[in-house]
């Protein structure tokens, strides 16, 4: 009877550990996506900064992917098209675009910190379960 109870406890423990492991993997993927978004915003901020001194008619190379570029000429150096999501963009001044990107970065950093906090809690609980599982090995 005690052996059956032990087996049930072990099965339950293993199921919990697998659930926590799955949750950790999902949280890590979420953290990676948030970090990629932060990197994207940083690239946009860097691009805005590098274009500030450029005037109308300034020529530059624009990346199109796969390490390829096209030649382009700046038509409106004081305006930036800012993506809002769902394939919707709005035209903003460079200063307004910078504020939008900085606000996005702040929100993304907050989301990343929250995600990492939950990830740490889940990792702690998983570690506790692993220590509990070690008791059954002895």
From Swiss-Prot:
One of the record's GO molecular function terms: unfolded protein binding
GO biological process, one term: protein folding
Domain of life: Archaea
Main location: cytoplasm
Function field: Molecular chaperone capable of stabilizing a range of proteins. Seems to fulfill an ATP-independent, HSP70-like function in archaeal de novo protein folding.
Subunit structure, interactors included: Heterohexamer of two alpha and four beta subunits.
Protein name: Prefoldin subunit alpha
Organism: Methanocella arvoryzae (strain DSM 22066 / NBRC 105507 / MRE50)
Lineage per the UniProt record: Archaea, Methanobacteriati, Methanobacteriota, Stenosarchaea group, Methanomicrobia
Name of the coding gene: pfdA
